[in-house]
Amino acid sequence: MSYIQNLVFTFRSKVPVILQTESSECGLACLAMISSYYGHYETIFTLRQKYSVSIKGSSLSDLIKIAGKINLNSRPLRLEMDELSKLRLPCIIHINMDHFVVLVSVNKKIEVIDPSLGKRFYSIDEFSDIFTGIALEIWPNSKFEKNEKKEIFNFFHLLHDLKSLLPSFSYILILAVVL
């Protein structure tokens, strides 16, 4: 009976969009997206705390080491544009000689999630101009553990929790106006 609850009737899972907060965090953001895609939810904040990144950002070898520490196998590849469709997706792609993005799909358009901009679509020609030929396939190993998605702080949840204090705030406001 419990197996029925785990069934998912979608054609593919979605890679969550996780935006980088600093210019040097594109690699960490890509790892957080792929780790979360497989069910181990990580934030850039927790990855930054656990694995320091230089001010220049992450190298491919840094990403491989960090992926290994969160029980993800990885395989760096050098490839041509026509080989993109053979990659295990989602994967990390190196573009513009200094930036990592997550490759989500390869069809008539190439769909990537850029940690600095969000979801983007490129034509084959557009993508060939920025693609450096480097990819990093990532997938869970046998020790990989899924975790619960942590609730993200939401300002409106805070207001809802403070609703019981609303009468007190209104008395204070009235006193402030009167005095």
Label every model-predicted segment.
Residues 1-179:
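Membrane-integrated ABC transporters
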